[in-house]
Every structure is written in C-alpha cells, then in structure tokens.
Amino acid sequence: MLALMDDIQSAVFACVAVVIAIYAVRWYTDPINSIPTVGGSSLPGLSLLTAWRTVHNCREVLTAGYRKYPDSVFKIAMFDSWLVIASGRNMIEEVRKRHDELSTTLGIQEALRSRYIRDRQVMTDEYHVRVVKEKMSGRTLQAMLPDVIEEVSIAVKDHIATQGSGWTSLEVVPAMQKVIFQVNNRAFVGPVLCRSKEYLNVAIDFSEHTFKWSAILSVTPEFVRRIIAPFINEAKNDTRRAVPLLRPIIEERMKAQADLGEGWHDKPNDILQFVLDKAIPKEESMFLIVHRLLIVNHAASGNSVNAITYVLYHLAENPDILQACREEAEAKIAADGWTSTALANMWRLDSILRETLRYHGTALVSMNRLATKDVVLSDGTRLPKGTFMQAAAYPLHRDGALVENAHTFDPFRYARMRDADGEGLKHQASTTSPEYIPFGHGQHACPGRYFAAYVLKAILAHLIVNYDLKLGGDGSRPPIRYVLSAVLPPPGGCVLLKERGEGSTTTTG
C-alpha cells in the first residue's frame, strides 16, 4: 500500500513538473518576452506585482520607459496580459504607417473593453465612426456650426445660473458636462431633443457608465470578466431608456424618407439623420440606432469636458491670460460676428486649448492599436498577433528635446509659433503630429476633433466675453487626478464667475 502511495505521489510530482516545464517553455519562447519590461519583473507571478505598480504609478512607469527606450517599444504589465508601449516620435510615426497590420478599430474596442459593454452587432460594423469621419469635417461641418454656435448661449443660460451682480460659485465639471452635451447634441439630434433634460441625463449616464466599466474591467483578470460580464448592463439599460425618447423623431424621419425620398428638401443635417441614412437600408433595430448615437455622444463629449475644465481653471487663475483671450475674442467677433470664421481666428484661445491638451492631456496614452497578425517592427521587435499597443503620450508631450520649456504651461506658445512661421494650420489644437497626439495621429486620428475644437472655443469665447472668472479659496488650481491611464479633473472643483457689466453685450444668441 505504501509503495502504491509512493507511486501515486511520484506520478503527481511528475505531472506537475511537466506542466511547469511546458509553461516555462511557452513563457520563454513567447515573442512578447523579448520586449523589455518596465515597472518591475516579467516573471510569472511577479508580473502581477508589476501590474499593481503600473495601476498605481502609471505616469511614472511610462516616463521611465520613455526615457530608457527612446524611439523603441517596451511593455508594461496588466493583470492578465501585456500592454506594449510605443515610445517616441519615430516609433509613433511607424505605428501610424502600419495601420493595415495594427488596427485602430480593434485597439479602441480593446481599450474600452467594448465586448463586455456594447452590443456585439454594433462592434462588427462601426459605420457610425465612418459617419463622424465623413460628416464632421469640411463643408458638412461648416453647415452645422451656425446652429451649434447658437446653442452655446442657450446651454449656458440653461445650466449656469448667476446671482445678480455678485460672484457665483460654479462646480465646473457637472456644469460643463451639461453645456457640452447640449451643444454637441444640437448637431447630433437637433434643437428639440438636445434641450431635453431627460435625454441629456441618459446620454451623460451612458458616457459615465462606459468609462466606469472600462476602468473596472481594465484591472480585472479575464476569468473574472467572463463571470461578471452578464451583469454589466448599465450602458445597454441606458440605451433602452433613450429609445422611447428618440423613437418619435426616428419614426417621423423614417416616414418622411419613405414618402419623399429624394424630394425631401428640408432633410435634417445632423448625426442622427446621417446614421439613419445607413441604418434604414440595413433594417437595423431602434435599439441599435440609439446605441450608436449614444456611443458617438460618449466619444465626442467625455474628453471635451475634461479639457474645457482645465482651460477654465487656467483662465480663472490668471487674469492677464483671461484678458488677452477676451480682447482677441471681442475683436474677432466685432469683425465677423459669432461665426466659425471668428472662432477660427481666435489664435490665443486655440493656443491655450492646444497647450492644455499637451501639458495636461486627457489620458497618459494614445493611439490604441491591436495587431491583426504577427508584426515585425523596423528595429526587429516582433509583435505577436493579438498584441495590444498604445503610445506614451504624457512623456512625449513633456519631452524637452521636442518642446521648449516642456514642463512649463505656456498658454500662448502656439499662437506665437503661428505668428513666427505663418503656418496656422500646423499649430491648431486639432492638428496632430508625431510630437502631439492627444487625438492620436494619422488617418485614424479622432475624426471628431475639428468639431470638438470649434465647440470648445465657442463655449470658452462666450464665457470669457460675458463673464468674469476667478478662483475661490486660496486662488490656486485644484490638483489633477491620475486614475490608471486617465487624467481627470478634481471632483467638486469650482470657479467663481459673475456677469460682466457694460461692454459685455456680445452673445452667441
């Protein structure tokens, strides 16, 4: 009997040894292990500690990797996989060129953990992204902007209430969230629904729930994700809440399209209609149409809220910067009225927006990519199929070799560059380059960035022309938060504002 027990024990130990050996061989022969690790050890088991460090010190880990491996790649640990980081402008340029092998669509889906949050039918054909790319630039965008600019004064009046001639404390994030969602939705769904509090609340909830679950799932092992996936229903429930709000408008437009066809001369010029033009031939359900619209809302609004919050803090902190931007805005409005031309010529306002996106950013990383096949980079690095990749944005934007006084916030840095070299487009907030990637870079850069820049400048111009701003308390800006790879404004942060008196009669309305 004892001999039998010894044989069983020996067999168990042998099986365990074989399993360990197989696992070790697979680990040592995995091409991903040839990529240097930053933040700790890459050994099995110890990599979990590395992942924990990355979660809590992502900014420091990215900066260390950027300095150690310039114009190359390195990897950082996630809880169940590796994230490969493109480091430096030369590698960013290579990633841009390899778009056939490094998919942006799949990369964004991986970054957001979309397969757990969004409807799978939407993910298989993201034509709403093509709609934004085709319609939110050029002549179509210019045709939208008069209505968008008009909506700014209405939205500010709806969501920012001042108290007589005195100073009013404004909690910036929730106020700007409502203003931006309303202004954006003037171009998305038209003037009636964009002012519906119920609809705006649903759109905001969808965006917040998407961010929340993306963050939670990014630090959750795969086996746990599979267990909790059936219970992640908030974004889909938000879509169901929005369906009855949008159904009357959608059904009315579908009927008009069926009855009038090419004779529908007053056909709406908004994102909902552009989505319907593609959805109707596909016979998509009401749920999927609304789901797509809310996804566009999330993409267009979340980062804009954070960006405008940082700009407002800087304007409220420094009265000289505020006055310089105000004088320019008033001069351009006097010349061209509240138009896209006036907004395009507000170089100082555009400069402070671009500098804010460079200096603070809305994320520490950018340019989500997923390898659709084995990829060999120019330096010989092999990326196995399925590798998830991002670019290190924060250390790139703070690189003193690329940006003079990179660790100093210089609000009019890019306005001076436009004056000096005469290349206005090159230094606009919406123009990407290998050194400036808050919107990504290349043909797959954020397609809504031109629209977003106009919206942000229109809101900022309206506020600085019609209101005085200052910081409360000790007059210092509240600190920014870094959560995983996200850059977030502080909760509860406020500025003080009051309506300007004589000389501030210019409005967007």
UniProtKB/Swiss-Prot annotation:
Keywords: Heme, Iron, Membrane, Metal-binding, Monooxygenase, Oxidoreductase, Transmembrane, Transmembrane helix
Name of the protein in its database record: Cytochrome P450 monooxygenase CYP512U6
Keyword Zinc-finger in record: no
Spans traversing the lipid bilayer: 12-29
Top-rank EC class of the record's enzyme: oxidoreductase
InterPro entries in the record: Cyt_P450, Cyt_P450_CS, Cyt_P450_E_grp-IV, Cyt_P450_sf
Topological type in the membrane: Single-pass membrane protein
Domain of life of the organism encoding this protein: Eukaryota
GO biological process assignments: secondary metabolic process; terpenoid biosynthetic process
Reaction(s) this enzyme catalyzes, per UniProt: ganoderate DM + reduced [NADPH--hemoprotein reductase] + O2 = hainanate A + oxidized [NADPH--hemoprotein reductase] + H2O + H(+); ganoderate TR + reduced [NADPH--hemoprotein reductase] + O2 = ganoderate Jc + oxidized [NADPH--hemoprotein reductase] + H2O + H(+)
PROSITE patterns (alphabetical): CYTOCHROME_P450
Binding site for heme: C446
The EC number(s) this enzyme carries: 1.-.-.-
Any single GO CC term annotated in Swiss-Prot or TrEMBL for this entry: membrane
Record pathway: Secondary metabolite biosynthesis; terpenoid biosynthesis
Cofactor dependency: heme
GO molecular function: heme binding; iron ion binding; monooxygenase activity; oxidoreductase activity, acting on paired donors, with incorporation or reduction of molecular oxygen
Family in the record: Belongs to the cytochrome P450 family.
Keyword hit for Calcium: no
Location within or outside the cell: Membrane
